[in-house]
Amino acid sequence: MGVFALTGHAQSSIALYGLIDNGIFYSTNQGGNHAVQFVASPTETSVWGLRGAEDLGGGNKAIFKLGSAFSTANGTTWPSGRLFGDYAWVGLSNSTVGTLKMGRMQDSVGDYLGDFAAGGNWGGVLYAHPLDNDNLWGTYMVNNAIKYQSISLAGLEFGGMYAFSNKSAATSGSGSGFVDNRLWAAGVEYSAGPVRLAAVYEQLDNSGDDVPGSYGAVDVADANFTAARQRIYGVGASYALDHIDLSANITRTVLSSPTGEWQNAQFTGASSMSFNNYEINAIYHATASLDLKGAYTYTTASVSGRSPHWNQLGLLVEYALSKRTSLYADGVYQRVHGDGSQFSYAQINSLSPASGDSQALLGVGIKHRF
C-alpha cells in the first residue's frame, strides 16, 4: 500500500499508506423516511498513516505504526478528533520469539477473527453484527495496550494483550481502580494449506469509564457498550478453493449491568444482556478484476427476559480498475423480530433506526488505496 518509502539507511524504512472510500446510498427506512445520502467509508475505513521498521540485526527489528482515520464527507478525524485514532504503537519483533507492541491498537477479536467476518474484512460497518456487539468491525480501539504475537510454529500462532486502566480510584470512589476500564484478551490461530481456524476470548471491565484528563483501555468515545463487564467469545474458520473463499464465524457477547450503547437510541439499561452471532460469507473471484461477495448473519439476544433476533443479508460486487482503485455496488438488508424488547426496530449499523422491523440500503461507491 505504501506509495513511497523514506530510507534512513539500507536497513530502515518509513512508508506512507492509506485508503479512501466513498459511496452514494439509498435507504428504505430511517425513522420512517426514505433517504439518498453520501456515505463516508461504507466498506472500509478511510485512513492515512505512517509505518516503519529498523533492522537491529540478529533477526530483531524496531517497528511502529501511526494511523489516522478520517471522514471523507467533511475531512474531520475520528474518533473524537484524534490525530492518530486508528493506530499509534511502537514495538520490537524477533524472527524466532515473535512481536511485542505497545500503544493504541486493534483488539484481539479483530486480530484473530476479523478475516473471517465480512464486517471485519471486506464489507465494513454496514456488515457488522447488530450493534457491532462483538467488535468484529472495530467500533473500539484499545488504549494503553501491550500485545504479544508469536511466530508461526508449524502453522500455529498465538498471542494476547493487556490494556491498563490508568486509574487510581474505583468507580465507586473508594478502593483500587486497577480493574476499572481495563481489557485483556488471548487468541490462537492454526493454518494448514487452504484451511484456517481461530479462537479468541476478550474481557473488558467498566469500559467507557473515563479517567479525567486521560483514557482508560476503552474510553467512552470508542466503546460499543458501557457495562460493568463485557465478555466476547469467538471462533472462526475459512477454506480457500480455486475461485471461492468460504468463511464462517460464531461469536457470543455477554454484558453485565449494561448502561449504554454507541449508536442505538432504543437502548436502555438491563441487569444483563447477551448476543449470539452466526455468520457465513463467501467471495467468488469471477475474473481477475471482478469479485462477487456475500454474507448472511443470524443473531439472537437475551434482554430482560425477551429474545429478539436479527436476520441480515449483504451482497457486494466489486470491479478493480487497477491494483489500487475499484468500483462497487453494495446492498444490505436487515429484519428484526423484537419480541417486545427494546430492539424492535431494524438498524443497519451506522444508520438511524427504522420505524419498523426491516431496513434496506443500496448504493455504489469508489475506493482507492495508496
Each language-model region and where it sits:
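Detector for outer-membrane/organellar transmembrane beta-barrel domains
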Residues: 179, 187-314, 333-334
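Residue-level detector of the transmembrane beta-barrel scaffold of outer-membrane proteins
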Residues: 15-17, 61-63, 99-101, 157-159, ...
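Outer-membrane beta-barrel architecture
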Residues: 49-51, 89-92, 147-149, 187-189, ...
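Extracellular loop and loop/strand-boundary signature of outer-membrane beta-barrel proteins
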Residues: 33-37, 76, 132-133, 170-174, ...
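Outer-membrane beta-barrel "beta-signal"
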Residues: 321, 356-370
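Sec/Tat signal peptide C-region and signal peptidase I cleavage site
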Residues: 4-10
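Outer membrane beta-barrel
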Residues: 11-27, 35-167, 180-182, 188-200, ...
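Gram-negative outer-membrane beta-barrel proteins
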Residues: 24-32, 70-76, 108-112, 166-170, ...
